[in-house]
């Protein structure tokens, strides 16, 4: 299954708030959800929705998500917690969480177009796994800085997780440590997803 490129608000109406997918929110007065999706929720449907939230928020394909679940399953800690840590330490997600891009797809495009450096080297793989003490910066050219400038100007420093630090003047961010569960930017029950 390929990456989703369709209407984003349709997914947000169905699954709830997905801050990595888009900044837009559906109209509050819409009662479409009540009209079409009322009734008892089955266990399968609840688990599927949790999986879809995870998939659409981080912009993953089905195969990528299964690969991350397989890696997390081999760990000695809780599978759900390790899975969220793996997804949060992806380069495209860290660029988004640092405020260098307004959405995760926007961050993925910055990385793919070679505007982002990790420890002084160009990295053009969005799924690159960042480690503690990695320094994420933009290229020194004016074009790269201009792309990041608008997002950083509208970024709220209060939303920055505790495992990251950012220097907005130098367009630089630092990964200090591995993420705690409470700082994940998505409201999700990872146990339901792992059961799926």
Swiss-Prot record:
Keyword rRNA-binding: yes
Keywords per UniProt: Chloroplast, Plastid, Ribonucleoprotein, Ribosomal protein, RNA-binding, rRNA-binding
All residue ranges annotated as the S4 RNA-binding domain in the record: 89-150
GO biological processes: ribosomal small subunit biogenesis; translation
Alphabetized InterPro entries for the sequence: Ribosomal_uS4 (IPR022801), Ribosomal_uS4_bac-type (IPR005709), Ribosomal_uS4_CS (IPR018079), Ribosomal_uS4_N (IPR001912), S4_RNA-bd (IPR002942), S4_RNA-bd_sf (IPR036986)
Major subcellular location class: plastid
Entries under Gene3D superfamilies matching the protein: Ribosomal Protein S4 Delta 41, Chain A, domain 1, RNA-binding S4 domain
Transmembrane segments: none
One Gene Ontology cellular component: chloroplast
Pfam family, one: S4
Protein localization: Plastid, Chloroplast
MF terms in GO: rRNA binding; structural constituent of ribosome
Subunit structure, interactors included: Part of the 30S ribosomal subunit. Contacts protein S5. The interaction surface between S4 and S5 is involved in control of translational fidelity.
NCBIfam families: PRK05327.1, rpsD_bact
Protein function: One of the primary rRNA binding proteins, it binds directly to 16S rRNA where it nucleates assembly of the body of the 30S subunit.
PANTHER family assigned: 30S 40S RIBOSOMAL PROTEIN, SMALL RIBOSOMAL SUBUNIT PROTEIN US4M
UniProt family annotation: Belongs to the universal ribosomal protein uS4 family.
Name of the molecule in the record: Small ribosomal subunit protein uS4c
Gene name of the record: rps4
């Amino acid at each position: 299954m390929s990456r989703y490129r369709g209407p984003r608000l349709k997914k947000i109406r169905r699954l709830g708030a997905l801050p990595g997918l888009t900044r837009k929110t559906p109209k509050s007065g819409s009662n479409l959800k009540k009209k079409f999706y009322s009734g008892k929720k089955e266990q399968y449907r609840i688990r599927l929705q949790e999986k879809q939230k995870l998939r659409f928020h981080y912009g993953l394909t089905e195969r990528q998500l299964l690969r991350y679940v397989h890696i997390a399953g081999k760990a000695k800690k809780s599978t759900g917690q390790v899975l969220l840590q793996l997804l949060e330490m992806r380069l495209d997600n860290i660029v988004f969480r640092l405020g260098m891009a307004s959405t995760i797809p926007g961050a993925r495009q910055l990385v793919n177009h070679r505007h982002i450096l990790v420890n002084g080297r160009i990295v053009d793989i969005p799924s690159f796994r960042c480690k503690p003490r990695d320094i994420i910066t933009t290229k020194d050219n004016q074009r790269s800085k201009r792309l990041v400038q608008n997002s950083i100007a509208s970024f709220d420093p209060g939303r920055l997780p505790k495992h990251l630090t950012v220097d907005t003047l130098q367009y630089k961010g630092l990964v200090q440590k591995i993420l705690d569960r409470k700082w994940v930017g998505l409201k999700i029950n990872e146990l339901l997803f792992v059961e799926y």
